[in-house]
Amino acid sequence: MSYFRNRDIDIERNSMNRSVQERKCRYSIRKLSVGAVSMIVGAVVFGTSPVLAQEGASEQPLANETQLSGESSTLTDTEKSQPSSETELSGNKQEQERKDKQEEKIPRDYYARDLENVETVIEKEDVETNASNGQRVDLSSELDKLKKLENATVHMEFKPDAKAPAFYNLFSVSSATKKDEYFTMAVYNNTATLEGRGSDGKQFYNNYNDAPLKVKPGQWNSVTFTVEKPTAELPKGRVRLYVNGVLSRTSLRSGNFIKDMPDVTHVQIGATKRANNTVWGSNLQIRNLTVYNRALTPEEVQKRSQLFKRSDLEKKLPEGAALTEKTDIFESGRNGKPNKDGIKSYRIPALLKTDKGTLIAGADERRLHSSDWGDIGMVIRRSEDNGKTWGDRVTITNLRDNPKASDPSIGSPVNIDMVLVQDPETKRIFSIYDMFPEGKGIFGMSSQKEEAYKKIDGKTYQILYREGEKGAYTIRENGTVYTPDGKATDYRVVVDPVKPAYSDKGDLYKGNQLLGNIYFTTNKTSPFRIAKDSYLWMSYSDDDGKTWSAPQDITPMVKADWMKFLGVGPGTGIVLRNGPHKGRILIPVYTTNNVSHLNGSQSSRIIYSDDHGKTWHAGEAVNDNRQVDGQKIHSSTMNNRRAQNTESTVVQLNNGDVKLFMRGLTGDLQVATSKDGGVTWEKDIKRYPQVKDVYVQMSAIHTMHEGKEYIILSNAGGPKRENGMVHLARVEENGELTWLKHNPIQKGEFAYNSLQELGNGEYGILYEHTEKGQNAYTLSFRKFNWDFLSKDLISPTEAKVKRTREMGKGVIGLEFDSEVLVNKAPTLQLANGKTARFMTQYDTKTLLFTVDSEDMGQKVTGLAEGAIESMHNLPVSVAGTKLSNGMNGSEAAVHEVPEYTGPLGTSGEEPAPTVEKPEYTGPLGTSGEEPAPTVEKPEYTGPLGTAGEEAAPTVEKPEFTGGVNGTEPAVHEIAEYKGSDSLVTLTTKEDYTYKAPLAQQALPETGNKESDLLASLGLTAFFLGLFTLGKKREQ
């Protein structure tokens, strides 16, 4: 019998008034028998929304456990006085309603807990370790449950003191007789760590004391441990440790857990009993401890920990500072589909201001995908009004596709990575870029070196290879093909192309018959092809970028025989403005050798021209004859992963020095100095730890302000390719750099970029960014001024409501301007004396409340009860918030929850939101066979305060005696892969950093993510979840 049929019978028999019925609709979730849709219909029919109370601890306190004074109170609607009409209910019905309401309570973090096919073994909420309980919460009565687990997850949400001990335990199992038999999840020097030891005292797992991810002292954190028993795929089992939802380290050494510790007797939070000693105590606030009966996946851990993900606080501009809104100059497609012009992706920005004041924005136009191969055109757009408006795209070159390619996704010769520069004397603008024959570019080069050029009678000619022959044919004057013995043939190569985008360059003719193209490599109809090598091409413009010359091959001028790869450091080159080499054009490039290629030989250098671009020369590499770890290296022979430097950006100081800012693998900024215009380099590379390098291209320019000399540098602030930063350095008299400011310029994804000075104290930046489903990447442009660079941004002093949004009938979302967390359910006090009650937390910034329809439009005066905490420890303010749609109640709603008529799941026609996997990409860890640096941890011997009547816990860090995890390879990005799979990694299964997807419901991009997706999901899924949770509790 359906819920609503029962409801009608009750109305007829008892003549209950509407208020009683509304309460039944609110609280009788467990009585639903026809599913969530019935409940939704009921809410619509009766004009009500279920009121959801704050969940208390999911288990009753242990019988032998002292109730702690620090426990948070549980706030429910039972605390309100009841209407007089409800006194007519019988005692049985009152008792039943009380039970119903108790079962209906849902977690304050319902969305984070909504996991499938998993059972809770132990759960403890809202406790503390402090002086009153000896810094320890005893859970020993749960030991038998733990011993039965073969696969498990231990998830803990906690807040340590800002000045916590060097080492403290979170959750542990230990023995009353054997001090070295235990399991502990702990924190060591703010690093989340882990240890398990058997009855013989031997370690189960690898070393976690130098794992990369740290907890935030004095703030809320989550640490999650998973263990999996041995299987065919995991012969020894696996353990993983996560911090705030992100995987910190994996160990495949053992899948042992509590069942493998026969003598353990104690289970505890905080101070740990090890035989006769109590150790590792600290003051902790524990929001939640949950043990599950299986290992959660990385995706599930991210979801369970979603409320603990936080970003840096958004700062405001100081007086006088200007940062324009971004303008998308080259806009990609969305959701994997091409844009209106058939282009899926744009990459590799290059920005140049010409002598006429025109801005030229250059890019890779990647038609099929964002990878570093396939159909890529070199394109530009021009602005003659300082970036306000932009002209149509102009294609410098785009070689034609192979119509019979074996793989169409890579079936084109490749042009990639552009550098723009203008000669101030001739006014000629140069575009220099890489070229590869059909294939995967730098990732598809031949393992065996093929000669690309042959010198004959003092002239250099390009070599052609003919199928089935070993001799070297050559392309000579007018494109005529010559045999290996120097005889002209009937074959002719197009060397002076005339078709649009010069797409016919490389076409091969026999007489007037087109046979194919010498740049094709698969299923080719041409009998010839060029060497599978890398090349450097140049185009130029003599009319301010409006039209461009056909590509010219400058490779033989600058590429030595030993170089496997030679490519540009994309962005903008410079012309030396003073010194003995004044007028010299400098273009950043980097090379690899045939010994170690991308794994150990990438080296930055300069190519230069002293005759206005007619001829080009290669300078020495920064790595040539440099001392590294006591050994002299050279770019032609080196095999040293850590010593590599790759794409770079170049500036000249007023004293004539040339500074090369290089992308590298040290995690910080590396700068080389040349005293001779970029031909040779000082042997010491200066490192600046104030500027992070997350192994991505950067851009730098030289500028003057009020007679003083400065460098402006822009790059991704990390932890991966995200959070664009502009850095300001003062140039000292000796040429050294003093870094003054580091200001954020773009939140979210941020990769390659290019800077230019625009004049009048204004600067421009063209950069890679994506949002709102854009493919990687869209190239966006912004302008900023000197005050933005040189002044500190203003930090927020409180967390406040940014906007409110009506999510459905009787439900409103409050979105804050920074991350918040609910521990004690807040009730909003309204100006009319009524209240709005807390439902649950939707994401890191959004809280859901129920409000009566007649109270919509009311202002919030404060909290009637409960609390909202800032994840950044700021005061939280709700006063003045208006309960209506829009920016803090002042802006009309853009989205409203539609009536749900489709199947359960996502609403409307929108696809489920795409989730992105976060990852840790910091400096720890290595690739290949090289061990990660071993970090030795000194034993802590300092004092600890006494807790209560118990002696102060002894600080004893877990002793690690097994194989150091530092000897195991971890993820490390080596070669730059600019496509959709943007990281090139060398990994082993033993230790790596997983990219787990964002579990929280993403908010649409408007600087911060807003609550539009709430609307698209609707309350349907929410109420369905509540029903499911209620049924689980009933069962």
Swiss-Prot record:
PROSITE patterns: GRAM_POS_ANCHORING. It is a peptidoglycan-anchor. It is found in: Secreted, Cell wall. A motif (LPXTG sorting signal) lies at residues 1003-1007. The modification Pentaglycyl murein peptidoglycan amidated threonine is found at residue 1006. Residues 94-112 have a biased composition (Basic and acidic residues). Keywords: Cell wall, Glycosidase, Hydrolase, Peptidoglycan-anchor, Repeat, Secreted, Signal. Residues 57-112, 902-951 are annotated as: Disordered. GO terms for biological process: ganglioside catabolic process; oligosaccharide catabolic process. InterPro entries: ConA-like_dom_sf, Glyco_hydro_33_N, Laminin_G, LPXTG_anchor, NanA_rpt, Sialidase, Sialidase_fam, Sialidase_sf. Gene3D superfamilies: 2.120.10.10, 2.60.120.200, Intramolecular Trans-sialidase, Domain 3. Substrate binds at residues 347, 663. This is Sialidase A. It comes from Streptococcus pneumoniae.
